[in-house]
């Protein structure tokens, strides 16, 4: 083995593990491993920057590299070799001057991985700019022209056929319902069961039957991206109907800030490696949306620094290429805009023109009511706020500013101390006015979160504790006294569609009424009857309000054990991770307990005692 690798470069996926294992084995036989080492994990992270996972199985799947028997030595080695060739191919596709810039940062790659960049650079004879623009040493994609929109057929099934989709009877009924709703001038509330393909069911009829722009609002950013990259992309490919994701400026990279960060070499190796990753990503992205970097959570502080503030100067080096600027232009030119409920409310509060003269579709409208509830209040963690104030005090050169900050710090600390003694939960009006006065005398960039919380729109303020396993977190809350009425956000001229599987809350009240609508049209598609489906309700289960976690868990365990005797597979769904873990701890039956970790993007097992019966 030593003779095989003596004059070679040692390449591995996670080379630190393999090289250390080999070096230890060779050492005991009297040899030293002196071969240069190259890590395909780090190289893949830099040159394929938008992947979610970089394990060998995951990246082979993304790059369509055959991996027949994962975790077997020969199969993994072959796959790593093919991955290495793919990485070299990607490097050689980049502009030569960009590769030179990456080489300047390549000492931040693990071991001797920079040798790969040197080797590729030596083989490049000319600049390879493809569809890229050199913008002060940062390569960006050239703007793509928006094609002329094609007319959709008035026949829903024909449009489906052009998209290569099969007809579904329930979806067609829903589309017909949307077409009927287009004819009336009142807000339309359409109820139809989940899973029938409602997105195409409302987009295609609205594009065919109306001329105005369409704004689609969904509850989450994830669903927002799914629609844009799924249905929106498919419709754009066939009908040239431009579909754009509408987000806050904070979602986009500010090129001026990134350019400045490139002029410094940070102490953190991984942060400098991240700069390499972003330089490659900028040659690929058309949006500049930082969420395209799936592992952004690893560099949270740096990404917050790079996030756009919504301001762009005409003197900027990147004026005309700024991503927030370009996204605003695309939003104005696009026929379909997709956003999320929270951002929609934030924009409409200040600017109703966003949807004026347009069609607004609120998908999963039942979630809008919850968003309105959240919109009527705001909170901030007091410990972090006090740390921010202390940092500002230590950095401020103005005596007046320091005195004002110290005053705010003292008042907040006193309020928290009284709260923890149990004497005062609600913040009195005179203290709020004092804090507002101090803030008004400070420069506008100080304590932005506290300024937003103490905004005049909030009328009631209080302190609240959240208890976690290791610590207690105190938060300052502000809220409106009355529930926000959605109608107050709307301009006079807008066509409204509210779509959900659950619009009817009870016989006495509907979602339309909760949102503040009196005159509206309700359309209902009866749910499909599943003859083999049965639902049982446990009438003996006690009221959950005030029920201790341990008692709640024990009651669930008892019911699982009774159901276990049916010999049918059991799936138990929880809304609380703590309850899941408590049940798993008490359950003696073989089972698999899992919960999702958003930070790591995967399901974590809490107990693995596999059984075909309980999951």
Predicted features along the sequence, with ranges:
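Acidic, Mg2+-coordinating catalytic module of metal-dependent nucleases/exonucleases
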Residues: 6-16, 20-26, 49-51, 55-118
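Conserved interdomain hinge at the start of the Helicase C-terminal
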Residues: 538-574
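Signature of the SF2 helicase/ATPase Hel1-core->accessory helical subdomain module
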Residues: 225, 229, 317-336, 341-438, ...
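A substrate-engagement module of RecA-like helicase motors
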Residues: 153-157, 212-214, 218-335
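A contiguous, basic/glycine-rich beta-loop/short-helix subdomain that forms a polymer-engagement track
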Residues: 311-335, 350-351, 435-552, 588, ...
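Walker A/P-loop
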Residues: 183-204
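Conserved helicase motor "Helicase C" RecA-like lobe of SF1/SF2 P-loop NTPases
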Residues: 574-597
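Conserved pre-motif I regulatory segment
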Residues: 145-190
